């Protein structure tokens, strides 16, 4: 049985609370100071693991108490996860570091069906959570008091650059056949696909972080943690299978022209990387400022292709959440997803596949993305993402009724009387599409257009999309 850790977080009035401060996420104009106080439920004398499998945090946000449920992201790494760097004389050094007891979590806010969370507990609490449609960031304060943390809204992070940032993909979408939405409406977890992702860090990014490989590694792991959460909506699971840091020099010519860099990276992956490391998709993270407003570029509909199942990403922000969204966006192109248009809707202020980054952080894929992704998968049937290769040594026994989906679960079992979820297997019963959620009724997704959350004040209602159990936030909210 997983022991649950209860941490009570008390907000404290701080002399400089509300003033500007420089954090790892950037310059923040308004923030609250909190002090996490750990209260463990483990029996006296019990051996406490470094990072618990499941945790809860009680905290106050804007004066209101909330409970944050977190669960260790057990499928974050593949079974053969490796890390490679280069010695000063150019020798390739590859290791398989232990990642069983890692410190990356995902979760939700209690009593908020539209909430999400991605948190790193490696050195204090760092990450983000969504509460009542607002995105909050949390990270440790570098003070003599090591327990102090800052919590702040994403909107209070100063914009690093007012210039527009956008994806470099400019393909003519009208050349594609119309998508038949009806054919995609009955997807269940049995259709799930699995992507083993390999990330490469160029020499410029290595130098940007002063050669601190540990800092780069933590940043990458948290960004994949965020990506993994975003792709759950598409029934796609992501596992990080390897990281390579070009610590000595670049292995290709990384240049401001993104198309040329993407072409070179694809060739290198095909002729070098794939010969020594099995994986499904590779991304290059670079400190190079691509020409124009471009911050990322990928081939479209190319998943599993030796050269073209690739993307290049500019490390364009101090906020790992923003770079993670760019990584998720470019991977979406590899899966055949196009840029969103005005007719597409999603649960966030901005959709992940929007061609231009919005000042409102993108959190979800749109209904269009869902349909286009599975249209590509069903038509092209990319074989490399059929196999599930997650770490079996990190999977603990599922805990029924903990309101979190754990490794191997399709639904949270609860009690044997659940008509949608088999309590013995934690799998959906035959014919069931869902077991819980504001848009789940009698084990089926509610019809598109059904009101799932009434508006407050002058705001707008939220509606079910007909293809998921969650209640997506209306993109036209005030």
Curated annotation (Swiss-Prot):
Q: In which tissues is it expressed?
A: Expressed by the venom gland.
Q: Which Gene3D superfamilies match?
A: Disintegrin domain
Q: Which residues form the propeptide?
A: 21-187, 390-405
| Disulfides per UniProt | 304-384, 344-368, 346-351, 411-426, 413-421, 420-443, 434-440, 439-464, 452-471
Known EC number: 3.4.24.-
Record GO cellular component, one term: extracellular region
- Ligand binding (Zn(2+)): 329, 333, 339
- Where is the Disintegrin domain positioned along the sequence? 397-478
The UniProt entry, under PROSITE patterns, shows: ADAM_MEPRO (PS50215), DISINTEGRIN_1 (PS00427), DISINTEGRIN_2 (PS50214), ZINC_PROTEASE (PS00142)
Which GO biological process entries does UniProt record here? apoptotic process; chemotaxis
Description of pH dependence: Optimum pH is 7.4 (strongest interaction with alpha-5/beta-1 (ITGAV/ITGB1)).
Q: Which residues catalyse the reaction?
A: 330
**Molecular function in Gene Ontology:** toxin activity
- Signal peptide residues are 1-20
Q: Does the UniProt entry include the keyword Zinc?
A: yes
In terms of CDD domains, this protein maps to: ZnMc_adamalysin_II_like
Annotated keywords:
Apoptosis, Calcium, Cell adhesion impairing toxin, Chemotaxis, Disulfide bond, Hemostasis impairing toxin, Hydrolase, Metal-binding, Platelet aggregation inhibiting toxin, Secreted, Signal, Toxin, Zinc, Zymogen
Taxonomically, which superkingdom? Eukaryota
What the record says about family reads: Belongs to the venom metalloproteinase (M12B) family. P-II subfamily. P-IIa sub-subfamily.
Write the protein's name: Zinc metalloproteinase/disintegrin
């Amino acid at each position: 049985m997983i022991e649950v850790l209860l941490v009570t977080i008390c907000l404290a009035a701080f002399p400089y609370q509300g003033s500007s401060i420089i954090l790892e996420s950037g310059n923040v104009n308004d923030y609250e100071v909190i002090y996490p106080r750990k209260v463990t439920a483990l029996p006296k004398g019990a051996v406490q693991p470094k990072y618990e499998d499941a945790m809860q945090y009680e905290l106050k946000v804007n004066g209101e108490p909330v409970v944050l449920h977190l669960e260790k992201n057990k499928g974050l790494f593949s079974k053969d996860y490796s890390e490679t760097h280069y010695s000063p004389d150019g020798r390739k050094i590859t290791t398989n570091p232990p990642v069983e007891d890692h410190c990356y979590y995902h979760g939700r806010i209690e009593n908020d069906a539209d909430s999400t969370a991605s948190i790193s507990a490696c050195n204090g609490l760092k990450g983000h959570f969504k509460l009542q449609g607002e995105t909050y960031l949390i990270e440790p304060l570098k003070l003599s008091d090591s327990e102090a943390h800052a919590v702040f809204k994403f909107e209070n992070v100063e914009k690093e650059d007012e210039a527009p940032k956008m994806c470099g993909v400019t393909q003519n979408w009208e050349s594609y056949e119309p998508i038949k939405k009806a054919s995609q409406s009955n997807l269940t977890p049995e259709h799930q696909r699995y992507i083993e992702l390999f990330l490469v860090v160029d020499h410029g990014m290595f130098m940007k972080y002063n050669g601190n490989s540990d800092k780069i590694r933590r940043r990458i792991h948290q960004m994949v943690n965020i990506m993994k959460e975003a792709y759950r909506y598409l029934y796609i699971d992501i596992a990080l299978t390897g990281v390579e840091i070009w610590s000595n020099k670049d292995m290709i010519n990384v240049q401001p022209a993104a198309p040329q860099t993407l072409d070179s990276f694809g060739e290198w992956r095909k002729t070098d990387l794939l010969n020594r490391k099995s994986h499904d998709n590779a991304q290059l993270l670079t400190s190079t400022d691509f020409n124009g407003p471009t911050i990322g570029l990928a081939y479209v509909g190319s998943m599993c292709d030796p050269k073209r199942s690739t993307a290049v990403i500019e490390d364009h922000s101090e906020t790992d959440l923003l770079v993670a969204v760019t990584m998720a966006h470019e991977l979406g192109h590899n899966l055949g997803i196009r840029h969103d248009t005005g007719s597409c809707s999603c649960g966030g202020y901005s959709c992940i596949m929007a061609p231009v980054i919005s000042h409102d952080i993108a959190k979800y894929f749109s209904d269009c993305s869902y349909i286009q992704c599975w249209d590509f998968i069903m038509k092209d049937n990319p074989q490399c993402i059929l196999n599930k290769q997650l770490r079996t040594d990190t999977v603990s026994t599922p805990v029924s009724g903990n309101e979190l989906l754990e490794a191997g679960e399709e639904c949270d079992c609860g009690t044997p009387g659940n008509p949608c979820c088999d309590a013995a297997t934690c799998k959906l019963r035959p014919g069931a599409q869902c077991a819980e959620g504001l848009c789940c009724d009698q084990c089926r997704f509610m019809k598109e257009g059904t009101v799932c959350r009434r508006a407050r004040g002058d705001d707008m209602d939220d509606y079910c999309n007909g293809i998921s159990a969650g209640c997506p936030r209306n993109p036209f909210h005030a």
